[in-house]
């Protein structure tokens, strides 16, 4: 059994259908009651926390007034903001220093090990050590359980284990990125139920804690030697470099550089179906993450529709073959607010959004959809992913819902309008096929009766024959023809106008997974288990067949191509183009499991990725092609190229690491350090050392010789209290800076036996060769307010030291100015991923940025472009008419997009066209979605050269923001303005 069949569990047994329905109704009632009770409990808990905070505020003010009598006021050089009384339900006294914070685990295997919990020290001890280590000269600003006088009432809310009145709290484990990412990639009903509209109680407590903590400003000590930031109530000390005369004079602005999406590597075929089509323009349309890709395989160009806010799960083509409807799942933004599932109808030529349908209507996600054919695509039918799999019919141009009805509690795999009968809709799925009659605002159902034919476990797909009959393919490998009766079979004993089985055809070994009706009336079928594509004539006799090679996986989608070609989407995320005579050619491919490892070549346009699927892939970033791939013995997690570019080191989950030849992909060397996940591999600038950061809290050092082909153990850095997350080398190979899952910033003296440098201020002026550590004076401004320390997965500084790219847990890629040494720094923010962004890396010449998605398995290539300073509404068109590499000084158009009112549930952002005509007037469509202050960023058609002849390109710069607006990082929604007519 393939696909959905493998992930569904039919465990309900009952004497009759009515009995089953009664039991389900009772269970649903109980679940609803429990949800109501939980909601009440959450509200009560929030009220208790609010009252407790108010009480402590009162006690603090009393103590402050008593302690201030007869005492001089403290020095005012230590700024500290107070917690306001606004939004009291979200306030909570910060007890985080009494909470044991488990290490952030980046992968599910690490989450199961429990190693971080075993090796952690109690947080109170860690704080005590941190304070004694860095605050000897300024004890007055040390975090203390006692109230602080004057302008520092916030300190009252912080309690440490030393406090006599402190009450120990339960250990709260910090969530891993995998836990915080959207669970949209799991197929079971249980996993879908994880997406709740109301945050669970365990999530409520840290969220309220974060609300209190985020008001803590960065503290600078009296002498101006170091500053402190707070993470979950814990102080993190960073020493100020000597070349900073006055910290207050530092200004952090938006970088002039911006990103535009150039290429999306990968395809989502693993858990989707019928999602590959060829448009009349010659482009293949498919999706990966939240991006819908229009790929011209002959010219090797891509265009991208970027309107979606989360995973795209299905698509349908309008009868005019120009307009497209795509449906997405529900998501959650960084503040825990739900992002509603919806359908977007858009123009594949202009990339402009025509309509947004179903906000607030669909639950969990959109499972399948289809345009009507008999009335030229006026209507759209949609099945959502709720328990009831609601069927809705829409006049999509008017955004009007015509009818709505529950279909079944079983999974629904397909929905289609009848091509000639505008009032007939067919749905199929697990153990059923339903024929719906749509009349005005009502839908009536007639169930397909299998009668003497064996009832399949799944009706997988359906199509229509030229005479109006319905053709279905099922999990038994059988095709059934359903014909509509015009007269009663037996007068008075049977209904007329119903569909009955008229013929059965054995088509495949295993399931019939997809059906494709061709323009000439012939039929293509795709098998699951046998991986065969069969061509059937007009009488449904098999004519030709071809088998998809096993390495590509099973068939998920089949579509007609040009001439005698056809397109195939597979379960291993390949899109193949083939013919029965010549076989298959790979057009699109990607990883098939969670992706973390990324490295860019030191002087070539190459990038390497490794993932849990055990694939190591080398990609050409200029030609957008795969150079080679190799299957290694274990899942890969991190990688780094030797400075010579001849070899690359791959770290795995088990502590083993491999060295591969970058040209031949041959195995050069293999080593093992510990038995836990390796999180970072980093060569020194001259390639003579390799540092290996592990989840066993150690950094292993190797001497490297023979251009990266020989390794000998040099030493081990011991001192971190949690697993290693990031590390960087100094230019002279003498020092290493490292971060851990416990928010530590440690420095190591390599020549003197890899010793920990106790006086960290000695390292404040080191000019690090690379900057990938997420904690440090030069980069701490990238952290959002109220962060729990797990929100940023990766950071990288450009080689020219102008910008920092950041990968976060909320599907966003950020671009900051470097250095970024002020809290709440503004950034450009970009959306394309639909899972936590796991890694970022600049190419060798800083022309591009590469980002990787975790569970969405995508690789996104962004082009860095300079923003031109233009007066508002003034446009400059690129007059380049020949195909040439896109310059970083491409013409841009500047426009300010008003921030939508926060009361709107979903910000309907206009999808901006990648190209404009000679009269570039922007069309702004509002999205109904709550977002942060947004910057519009137009996506040009991504290709190896510039646009088609005569089509000027443009870029829309972001809005400049004030210091007040910079409190929340700017949201840079990729949007495509439609061209003016």
From Swiss-Prot:
Origin species, per record, is: Homo sapiens (Human)
Please give the name of this protein: Echinoderm microtubule-associated protein-like 4
Instruction: PTM Phosphoserine: list the residues.
Output: 7, 13, 16, 61, 134, 144, 146, 171, 200, 891, 895, 903, 978, 981
| Gene behind the chain | EML4
Please spell out the taxonomic lineage of the organism that makes this protein.
Eukaryota, Metazoa, Chordata, Craniata, Vertebrata
N-acetylmethionine-modified residues are 1
Enumerate composition-biased segments (Low complexity): 137-155
PTM statement from Swiss-Prot or TrEMBL: Phosphorylated during mitosis. Phosphorylation at Ser-144 and Ser-146 promotes its dissociation from microtubules during mitosis which is required for efficient chromosome congression.
On assembly, the entry states: Homotrimer; self-association is mediated by the N-terminal coiled coil. Interacts (via WD repeats) with NUDC. Interacts with alpha- and beta-tubulin during mitosis.
Recorded hits in Pfam families, A to Z, give:
Beta-prop_EML, Beta-prop_EML_2, HELP
Q: Which family does it belong to?
A: Belongs to the WD repeat EMAP family.
Q: What does this protein do?
A: Essential for the formation and stability of microtubules (MTs). Required for the organization of the mitotic spindle and for the proper attachment of kinetochores to MTs. Promotes the recruitment of NUDC to the mitotic spindle for mitotic progression.
The Swiss-Prot or TrEMBL record annotates one GO molecular function as:
beta-tubulin binding
């Amino acid at each position: 059994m393939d696909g959905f069949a493998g992930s569904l569990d039919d465990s309900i047994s009952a004497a009759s259908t009515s009995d089953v329905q009664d039991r389900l109704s009772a269970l649903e009632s109980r679940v609803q009651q429990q949800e109501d009770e939980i909601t009440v409990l959450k509200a009560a808990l929030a009220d208790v926390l609010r009252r407790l905070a108010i009480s402590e505020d009162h006690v603090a003010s009393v103590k402050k007034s008593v302690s201030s009598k007869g005492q001089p006021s403290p020095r005012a050089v230590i700024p500290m903001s107070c917690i306001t009384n606004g939004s009291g339900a979200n306030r909570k006294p910060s007890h985080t220093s009494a909470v044991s914070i488990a290490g952030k685990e980046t992968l599910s295997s690490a989450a199961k090990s429990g190693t971080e919990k075993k090796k952690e020290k109690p947080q109170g001890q860690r704080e005590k050590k941190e304070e004694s280590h860095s605050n000897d000269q300024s004890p007055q600003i040390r975090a203390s359980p006692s109230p602080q006088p004057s302008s520092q009432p916030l300190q009252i809310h912080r309690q440490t284990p030393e406090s006599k009145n402190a009450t120990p709290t339960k250990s709260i484990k910090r969530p891993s990125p995998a836990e915080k990412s959207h669970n949209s990639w799991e197929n079971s009903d249980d996993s879908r139920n994880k997406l709740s509209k109301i945050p669970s109680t365990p999530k409520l407590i840290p969220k309220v804690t974060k609300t209190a903590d985020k008001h803590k400003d960065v503290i600078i000590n009296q002498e101006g030697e170091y500053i402190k930031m707070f993470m979950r109530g814990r102080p993190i000390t960073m020493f100020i470099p000597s070349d900073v005369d006055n910290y207050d004079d530092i200004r952090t602005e938006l970088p002039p550089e911006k990103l535009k999406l150039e290429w999306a590597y990968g395809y989502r075929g693993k858990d989707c179906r019928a999602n590959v089509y060829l448009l009349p323009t010659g482009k293949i349309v498919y999706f990966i993450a939240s991006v819908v890709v229009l790929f011209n395989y002959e010219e090797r160009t891509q265009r991208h529709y970027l309107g979606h806010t989360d995973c795209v799960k299905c698509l349908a083509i309008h009868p005019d073959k120009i307009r497209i409807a795509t449906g997405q799942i529900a998501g959650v933004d960084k503040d825990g607010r739900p992002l509603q599932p919806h359908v977007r109808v858009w123009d594949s030529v202009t990339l402009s959004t025509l309509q947004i349908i179903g906000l607030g209507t669909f639950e969990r996600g959109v499972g399948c959809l289809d345009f009507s054919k008999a009335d030229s695509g006026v209507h759209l039918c949609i099945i959502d992913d709720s328990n009831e799999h609601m069927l809705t019919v829409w006049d999509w141009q008017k955004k009007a819902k015509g009818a709505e009805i529950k279909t079944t509690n079983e999974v629904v795999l397909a929905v289609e309008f009848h091509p000639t009968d505008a009032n007939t809709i067919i749905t199929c799925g697990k153990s059923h096929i339903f024929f719906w009659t749509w009349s005005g605002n009502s839908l009536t159902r007639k169930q397909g009766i299998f009668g003497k034919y064996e009832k399949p476990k799944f009706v997988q797909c359906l199509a229509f024959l030229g005479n109006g009959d319905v053709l279905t393919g099922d999990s038994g490998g059988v095709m059934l023809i359903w014909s509509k009766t015009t007269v009663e079979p037996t007068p008075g004993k049977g209904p007329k106008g119903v569909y009955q089985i008229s013929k059965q055809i054995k088509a495949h070994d295993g399931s019939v997974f997809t059906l494709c009706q061709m323009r000439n009336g012939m039929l293509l079928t795709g098998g699951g288990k046998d991986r065969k594509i069969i061509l059937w004539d007009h009488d449904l006799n098999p004519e030709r067949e071809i088998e998809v090679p096993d390495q590509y996986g099973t068939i998920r989608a089949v579509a007609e191509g040009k001439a005698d070609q056809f397109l195939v989407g597979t379960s291993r995320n390949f899109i193949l183009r083939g013919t029965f005579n010549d076989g298959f050619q790979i057009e699109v491919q990607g990883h098939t499991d969670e992706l973390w490892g990324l490295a860019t070549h030191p002087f070539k346009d190459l990038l390497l990725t490794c993932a849990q699927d055990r694939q190591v892939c080398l990609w050409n970033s200029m030609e957008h092609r795969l150079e080679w791939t190799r299957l290694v013995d274990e899942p890969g997690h991190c990688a780094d190229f030797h400075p010579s570019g001849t070899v690359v080191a791959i770290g795995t989950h088990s502590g083993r690491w491999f060295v591969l030849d970058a040209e031949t992909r041959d195995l050069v060397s293999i080593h093992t350090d510990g038995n836990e996940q390796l999180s970072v591999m980093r060569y020194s600038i001259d390639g003579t050392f390799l540092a290996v950061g592990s989840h066993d809290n150690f950094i292993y050092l190797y001497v490297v010789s023979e251009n990266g082909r020989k390794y000998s153990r040099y030493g081990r850095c011991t001192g971190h209290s949690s697993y290693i997350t990031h590390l960087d080398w100094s230019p002279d190979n003498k020092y290493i800076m490292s971060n851990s899952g416990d928010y530590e910033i440690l420095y190591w003296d390599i020549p003197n036996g890899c010793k920990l440098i106790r006086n960290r201020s000695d390292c404040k002026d080191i000019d690090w060769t690379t900057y990938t550590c997420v904690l440090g004076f030069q980069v701490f401004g990238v952290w959002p307010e109220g962060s729990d320390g797990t929100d940023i997965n990766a950071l990288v500084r450009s080689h020219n030291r102008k910008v920092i790219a950041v990968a976060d847990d909320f599907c966003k890629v950020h671009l900051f100015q470097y250095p970024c040494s002020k809290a709440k720094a503004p950034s450009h923010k970009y959306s394309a991923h639909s899972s936590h962004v796991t890694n970022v890396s600049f190419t060798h010449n800083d022309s591009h940025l590469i980002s990787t998605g975790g569970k969405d398995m995508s690789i996104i290539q962004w082009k860095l472009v300079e923003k031109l300073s233009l007066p508002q509404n003034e446009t400059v068109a690129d007059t380049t008419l020949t195909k040439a590499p896109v310059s970083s000084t491409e013409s841009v158009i500047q426009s300010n997009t008003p921030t939508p009112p926060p009361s709107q549930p979903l910000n309907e952002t206009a999808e901006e066209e990648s190209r404009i005509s000679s009269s570039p007037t922007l069309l702004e469509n509002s999205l109904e979605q709550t977002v942060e202050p947004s910057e519009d960023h137009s996506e040009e058609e991504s290709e190896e050269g510039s646009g088609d002849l005569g089509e000027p390109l443009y870029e829309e710069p972001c809005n400049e923001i004030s210091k007040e607006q910079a409190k929340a990082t700017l949201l840079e929604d990729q949007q495509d303005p439609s061209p003016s007519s």
